[in-house]
């Protein structure tokens, strides 16, 4: 019943595969200084993580709610999938042009910036450690790139790779081994890497998807305060 209550209150719902996708969207909105999108995503909204990229599952949930809340609107964001999405419906369905949302911050500079991050600690030991971490990360990246090439796979930075499974997981496994540490960043934490992508590196498609979210939110007549 909680979902019906949220649907009645908000009048719109956002579907993503997981909460990390939502966190990445929030990070990008902040970096772009897209105030309306930040206001919406930082507010109390109705988000429903589907746990998969199956459009029928999002549709079933949405239209089940819409039977009770007939003015409900929604937007669903999917990874690039081999499924036909529907257009012109109460549920706006969109997919990423790249394999998944993590591909939009997948680049060497982001990983090196992450490895070299000293946060607020800039003493000499931390700076030396940061350089060593960057060296370890570069070695990990090069080893994974070489392995992919040997296996006849895509280039490591290809938008057709599944960024999480094909690149980030093996890179962080090797990186952690080189540092003699347990895995330092796991799949449900990859969203943190988006912080290390500069504003000018954000793909125009991100703004397009944020525009679509803002449009749906603006068209709804829900309560933005509860």
What are these regions (language model features)?
Residues 84-226:
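C-terminal accessory helical subdomains adjacent to catalytic cores in phosphodiester-
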Residues 1-84:
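RecA-like P-loop NTPase motor core
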């Amino acid at each position: 019943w909680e979902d019906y209550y949220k649907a009645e209150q908000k009048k719109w719902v956002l579907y993503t595969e997981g909460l990390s996708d939502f966190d990445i969207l929030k990070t990008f909105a902040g970096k772009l200084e897209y105030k309306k999108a930040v206001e919406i995503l930082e507010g109390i909204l109705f988000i429903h993580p589907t746990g998969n990229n199956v459009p029928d599952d999002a549709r079933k949930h949405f239209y089940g709610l819409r039977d009770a809340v007939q003015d409900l609107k929604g937007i669903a964001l999917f990874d690039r999938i081999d499924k036909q999405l529907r257009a012109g419906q109460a549920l706006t369905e969109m997919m990423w042009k790249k394999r998944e949302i993590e591909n939009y911050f997948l680049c060497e500079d982001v990983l090196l910036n992450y490895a070299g991050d000293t946060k607020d600690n800039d003493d000499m030991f931390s700076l030396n450690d940061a350089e060593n971490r960057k060296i370890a990360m570069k070695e990990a990246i090069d080893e994974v790139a070489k392995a992919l090439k040997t296996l006849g796979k895509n280039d490591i930075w290809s938008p057709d790779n599944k960024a999480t499974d094909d690149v980030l997981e093996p890179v962080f496994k090797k990186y952690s081994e080189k540092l003699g540490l347990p895995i330092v960043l796991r799949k449900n934490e990859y969203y943190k890497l988006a912080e290390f992508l500069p504003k000018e590196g954000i793909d125009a498609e991100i703004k397009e998807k944020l525009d679509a979210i803002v449009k749906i939110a603006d068209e709804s007549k829900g309560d933005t305060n509860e």
